[in-house]
């Protein structure tokens, strides 16, 4: 599997868990990507649940490191 395929697979899982989630992807290398997910508070755990094991599986089976960070899109910006 390619990194692009893995990112698409994870994005599809995220969108299935929360259609309103916004996903921003940064490719760090040919084998590593970071997905920043902005979702409502009520959907954050659901997204974590549907992406955790697949991310581990991609790392173990394909050597692809897909990191998924989930943020509350309704939280006020940090001060300081």
Which ranges hold each PLM region?
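Short, non-transmembrane amphipathic alpha-helical segments
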Residues: 10-14, 45-64
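Short beta-strand-to-loop capping motifs
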Residues: 37-41
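A short amphipathic beta-strand at an alpha->beta junction
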Residues: 60-80
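Residue-level signal for secondary-structure boundary sites
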Residues: 43-45, 76
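Short amphipathic alpha-helix segments
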Residues: 2-17
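Short edge beta-strands and adjacent turn/loop segments
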Residues: 15-35
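Charge-dense, low-complexity intrinsically disordered segments
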Residues: 1, 42
């Amino acid at each position: 599997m390619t990194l692009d395929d893995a990112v698409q697979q994870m994005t599809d899982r995220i969108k299935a868990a929360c259609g309103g989630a916004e996903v921003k992807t940064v490719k760090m290398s040919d084998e590593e990507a970071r997905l920043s997910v902005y979702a409502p508070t009520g959907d954050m755990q659901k997204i974590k649940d549907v992406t955790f094991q697949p991310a581990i599986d991609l790392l173990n089976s394909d050597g692809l490191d897909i990191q998924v960070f989930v943020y509350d899109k309704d939280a006020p910006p940090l001060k300081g």
